[in-house]
């Protein structure tokens, strides 16, 4: 006879196990045996996902009236399941996590009742996602225990929020807003200010103004309305230590980033740069990030996307980045390295340079940072020769002639190099031959050691 080892586990352990699966499956275990019948109240994580319910396809030949009726039944089956489950758990202990994903349900009053029930039961983590626009009743949208909140797509805070300075979630540390439509520009900032303990903020919304005195980590993806040139962007976060910002470039920036240590920037131009036959450009470019770069000039770690390299070159007067010790860039065959000489010259204390992909657009403005165009032997001192970089990390190396030429350029110019780490592009052929070619390159630094990772 087979032994049911799981059923012999203590109740609290079984409750934890059931909390790891979707609530529909957890509820279904109650019919397995008497042992499982009363375990559902021990579940401390509720995951109501409408896609987990069974929606049978319409039968062939079903008339329009029957199709509508069956559609209505399918539409409400999810709601009945949630209502029944919450009723069974009315006397259960704390609900640590409550996740609600609605794709057909549009009964706002009923959904707000579910949310209110979760918050009243001391919920620590709340995830809300909807396909339809569903307002959350702001009058009851408050909790003294909530630590993590995620709102996505159709859900949005409705009604009238508390006055500016009012507190909604005094314990909230992590807030994520994805494609959430606030009823006014000010409302999103009222909402953020209602979370005084906030430490981590993820925003995927169109915005021009964001302020939080205490938040330490912010990720902003604001890629909407790319046809509308944004006049300005305001970011007041004096306690921020990490910024991940992805957006089209603004006309100007008004920022307070006094504590910033690390920045990951993906800034894009509204119009692509048009080069003439000589690889030069002569068009006017919208945007000015000078104030933004001035505000982050004391950072230690900087990551730049291929588009950001363009924006840094065309849209700012680059200040000296005295404290920058780690610079990471990503290349693209359609984007040039024009800013690299300026960026390296303005980073006098740079220790680590990370380059993801060596292939980039060939222009006459890359200077001596790359080996794409042979420079005349007039020689001014190379920006690489003045660079104090000790660690060079190359990712996605494919071993092409252009890549090998650039590796030769780096190894022959960077005088302070001690370690070179090369990550080979996945699927690259002739790996032994590729490694041998790099290892055979001359090195200006006698301390330079090459590692393949």
From Swiss-Prot:
One Pfam family matching this protein: F-box
Pathway: Protein modification; protein ubiquitination
UniProt xrefs under Gene3D superfamilies: Ribonuclease Inhibitor (3.80.10.10)
Keyword Cell cycle: no
Sorted UniProt keywords: Ubl conjugation pathway
F-box domain segment(s): 3-51
InterPro entries, alphabetized: F-box-like_dom_sf, F-box_AtFBL13-like, F-box_dom, FBD, FBL60-like, LRR_dom_sf, LRR_FXL15/At3g58940/PEG3-like
GO CC aspect terms: cytoplasm; nucleus
GO biological process: protein ubiquitination
SMART domains attached to this UniProt entry: FBD
Keyword Thylakoid attributed: no
Domain notes: The F-box is necessary for the interaction with ASK proteins. Interacts with ASK4.
Function: Component of SCF(ASK-cullin-F-box) E3 ubiquitin ligase complexes, which may mediate the ubiquitination and subsequent proteasomal degradation of target proteins.
Subunit structure: Part of a SCF (ASK-cullin-F-box) protein ligase complex.
Listed name of the protein: F-box protein At4g27050
Originating species: Arabidopsis thaliana (Mouse-ear cress)
Lineage: Eukaryota, Viridiplantae, Streptophyta, Embryophyta, Tracheophyta
């Amino acid at each position: 006879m087979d032994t049911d080892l799981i059923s012999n586990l203590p109740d609290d352990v079984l409750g934890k196990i059931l909390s790891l699966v979707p609530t529909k499956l957890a509820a279904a275990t109650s019919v397995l045996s008497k042992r499982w019948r009363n375990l559902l109240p021990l579940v401390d994580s509720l995951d109501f996902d409408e896609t987990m319910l069974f929606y049978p396809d319409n039968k062939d030949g079903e008339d329009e009236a029957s199709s509508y009726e069956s559609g209505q039944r399918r539409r409400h089956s999810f709601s009945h399941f949630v209502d029944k489950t919450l009723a069974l758990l009315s006397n259960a202990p704390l609900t640590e996590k409550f996740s609600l994903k609605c794709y057909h349900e549009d009964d706002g009053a009923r959904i707000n009742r579910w949310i209110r029930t979760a918050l009243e039961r001391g919920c620590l983590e709340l995830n809300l996602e909807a396909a339809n626009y569903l307002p959350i009743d702001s009058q009851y949208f408050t909790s003294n225990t909530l630590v993590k909140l995620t709102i996505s797509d159709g859900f949005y805070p409705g009604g009238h929020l508390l006055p500016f300075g009012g507190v909604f979630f005094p314990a909230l540390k992590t807030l994520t807003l994805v494609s959430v439509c606030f009823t006014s520009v000010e409302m999103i900032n009222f909402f953020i200010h209602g979370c005084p303990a906030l430490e981590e903020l993820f925003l995927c919304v169109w915005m021009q103004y964001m302020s939080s005195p205490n938040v330490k980590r912010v990720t902003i993806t604001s890629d909407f309305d790319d046809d509308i040139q944004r006049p300005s962007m305001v970011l007041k976060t004096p306690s921020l230590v990490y910024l991940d910002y992805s957006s089209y470039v603004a006309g100007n920036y008004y920022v307070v980033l006094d504590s910033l240590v690390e920045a990951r920037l993906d800034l894009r131009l509204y119009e692509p740069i048009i080069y003439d036959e000589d690889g030069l450009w002569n068009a006017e470019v919208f945007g000015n990030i000078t104030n933004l770069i001035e505000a982050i000039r004391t950072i230690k770690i900087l990551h730049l996307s291929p588009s950001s390299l363009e924006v840094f070159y065309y849209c700012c007067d680059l200040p000296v980045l005295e404290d920058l010790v780690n610079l990471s860039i990503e290349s693209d065959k359609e984007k040039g390295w024009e800013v690299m000489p300026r960026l390296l010259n303005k980073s006098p204390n740079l220790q680590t340079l990370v380059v993801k992909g060596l292939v980039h657009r060939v222009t006459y403005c890359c200077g001596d940072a790359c080996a794409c165009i042979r420079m005349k032997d007039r020689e001014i001192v190379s920006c690489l020769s003045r660079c104090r970089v000790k660690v060079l990390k190359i990712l996605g190396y494919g071993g092409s002639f252009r890549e090998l030429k650039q590796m030769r350029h780096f190894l022959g110019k960077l005088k302070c190099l001690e370690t070179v780490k090369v990550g080979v592009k996945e699927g690259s052929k002739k790996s032994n031959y590729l490694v041998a070619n790099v290892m055979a390159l001359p090195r200006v630094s006698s301390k330079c050691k090459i590692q393949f990772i």
